[in-house]
Design a protein with these regions (language model features):
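Binuclear metal-dependent hydrolase catalytic cores
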Residues: 1-118
Length: 118
């Protein structure tokens, strides 16, 4: 297993880092925690067709600000996104005009799942 910190900053990007995004590369999966602006580096680390799972911890801006970059990615596999209740609605607002193209136009297919407490 390899852990890569793509972003570790708090509220905003700086010369030395981006907002939160962590990649865990395991034998069977890629697991991504949060979608801060560090997410734009993700495709540099995805070099196989292992499933990709993205977990959104919460909807503060610095944890989802990188979602607009999904239009850059050309992953062959589905990108599975997990988040709390309301994730679909948030994604439909953030992954849309005027920020980026709508979800339906993304080159990578998304599968969105909402998790409940408990």
């Amino acid at each position: 297993m390899k852990v890569t910190f793509l972003g570790t900053n708090g509220w905003y990007n700086t010369e030395t880092g981006n907002t939160p995004c962590v990649l865990v590369d395991t034998e069977k999966y890629y697991i991504v925690f949060d979608a801060g602006d560090g997410l734009y580096k993700l495709d540099a680390y995805i070099d196989s067709d292992k499933p990709i799972y993205l977990f959104l911890s919460h909807f503060h801006a610095e944890h989802i600000s990188g979602l607009h970059i999904l239009s850059k990615f050309r992953f062959k596999q589905v990108l599975h996104i997990y988040g709390q209740e309301g994730t679909r609605d948030i994604l439909k607002r953030v992954i849309a005009h005027p920020f980026t193209c709508p979800i339906s136009a993304l080159p990578t297919k998304l599968r969105i799942r909402e998790l409940s407490e408990g």
